[in-house]
């Protein structure tokens, strides 16, 4: 790679399905993917949303160590700490409050003090929730139906204490501060409804790991996380696949890891549940947003190639339209103080060929499932095919897979 060029990795959100990202990272860093010319890579730029934010921060916080060793350590964390194993008391991400079955779990049976401590805390939290909701129900002027519906709140029964502890123990702020890699994490301002991108320096020196926790706070399941007094939730609400931030950080070769397949490969269920419908709606929104970003990347290549030929008037009507749209964005970027030497971009896309479980799968942390997702991601990277997944390559338009 020539001077000024950087390799970047973009990690999407998707809860437990994030184990798939670990498999792809493992293949890329071990040099077994055709996307890297079968050469191991050690990316300089990472961006991530939700679970992708955790994976990205983990990789960046281990800067200075061989990337192969770091991905193997990340895999071990997923299979030993994140996963729900026969000897663990639940998973490493969330706990269901007041669940009596945990006392029958062999892993919990071996940790009676932890179970007792959790039970006391859960009782307190549920009592607090009941008092607050009861007061709201009694004093609200809304209709009885509206007040009854307002009592439904999954957040009351979900504790994020496990992921709080996981992030605090696995992501060192001092290590982030020393890292030579670039990191950007996406989170959504729950008050203003705007996206915020947290840089590595902001996380290490100002806001701490709360930014990573906020990026993974799935609305309706986990409560908003206050960062500098402002509530933030999952970055996937507004930007589930932060490609443009990676390009702005200087990445010229970008590896995007999606956690959902091409929409056309996901068969519509004849009798979908509400969760199925909501999940497909989100997938369509995410697909639309990231397709625009991929087209921008292809447009940057087009502009540079037309300028090299010195004859933009010879372009097709579609090329000319793309030229004008992307040229305007490049001009705005430069006028806002982001002037830089634009380079041609290479974008490789990785995604599962079938649905990983859709809505319900994002909370399924069973070890066997996570191990299978790691293997799937690894194999998909080993068998990477631009003709199937879609790539942006200099001199070529985005492949058919770019249209999700």
Please annotate each region the language model reported.
Residues 146-148, 162, 167, 306-404:
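C-terminal helical/tail subdomains of lipid-metabolizing enzymes
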Residues 47, 186, 255-257, 346-350:
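Hydrophobic/aromatic beta-strand patches that form the interior of the parallel beta-sheet core
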Residues 13-16, 191:
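Short polar catalytic/cofactor-binding loops
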Residues 11, 46, 232-234:
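Short hydrophobic beta-strand that contains or immediately precedes a catalytic carboxylate
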Residues 268-309:
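Acidic, Ser/Thr-rich peripheral helices and adjacent loops at domain boundaries
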Residues 5, 179-181, 343:
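Short, basic and Ser/Thr-rich N-terminal targeting/leader segments
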Residues 2-8, 16-155, 161, 167, ...:
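Patatin-like phospholipase
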Residues 135-251, 256-257, 263-276, 362:
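Active-site gating loop/helix substructures
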């Amino acid at each position: 790679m020539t001077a000024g060029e950087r390799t970047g990795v973009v990690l999407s959100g998707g809860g437990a399905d994030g184990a798939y990202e670990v498999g792809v990272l493992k293949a890329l860093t071990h040099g077994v993917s055709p996307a890297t010319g079968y050469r191991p890579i050690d990316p300089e730029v990472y961006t991530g949303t939700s679970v992708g934010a955790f994976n990205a921060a983990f990789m960046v916080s281990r800067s200075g160590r061989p990337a192969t060793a770091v991905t193997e350590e990340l895999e071990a964390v997923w299979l030993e700490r994140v996963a729900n194993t026969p000897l663990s008391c639940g998973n490493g991400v969330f706990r269901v409050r007041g669940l009596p079955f945990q006392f029958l779990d062999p892993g919990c049976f071996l940790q009676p003090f932890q179970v007792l401590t959790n039970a006391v805390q859960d009782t307190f939290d549920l009592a607090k929730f009941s008092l607050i909701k009861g007061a709201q129900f009694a004093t609200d002027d809304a209709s009885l139906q509206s007040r009854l519906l307002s009592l439904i709140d999954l957040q009351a029964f979900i504790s994020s204490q496990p992921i709080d502890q996981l992030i605090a123990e696995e992501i060192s702020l001092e290590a982030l501060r020393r890292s030579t890699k670039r990191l950007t994490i996406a989170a959504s301002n729950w008050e203003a409804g705007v996206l915020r991108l947290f840089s590595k320096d902001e996380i290490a020196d100002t806001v701490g790991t709360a930014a990573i926790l906020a990026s993974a706070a799935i609305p309706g399941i986990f409560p908003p996380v206050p960062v500098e007094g402002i509530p933030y939730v999952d970055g996937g609400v507004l930007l589930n696949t932060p490609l443009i931030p990676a390009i702005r950080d200087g990445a010229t070769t970008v590896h995007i890891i999606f956690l959902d397949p091409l929409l056309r490969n996901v068969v519509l269920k004849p009798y979908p549940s509400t969760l199925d419908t909501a999940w497909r709606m989100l997938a369509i929104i995410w697909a639309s947003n990231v397709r625009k970003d991929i087209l921008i990347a292809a447009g940057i290549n087009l502009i540079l190639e037309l300028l090299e030929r010195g004859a933009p008037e010879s372009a097709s009507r579609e090329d000319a339209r793309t030229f004008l749209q992307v040229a305007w964005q490049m001009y705005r970027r430069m006028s806002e103080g982001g002037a830089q030497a634009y380079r041609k971009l290479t974008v490789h896309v990785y995604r599962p060929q079938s649905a990983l479980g859709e809505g319900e799968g994002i909370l399924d942390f069973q070890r066997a499932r996570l191990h299978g997702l790691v293997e799937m991601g690894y194999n998909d990277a080993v068998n990477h095919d631009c003709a199937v997944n879609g790539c942006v390559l200099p001199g070529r338009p985005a492949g058919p897979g770019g249209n999700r």
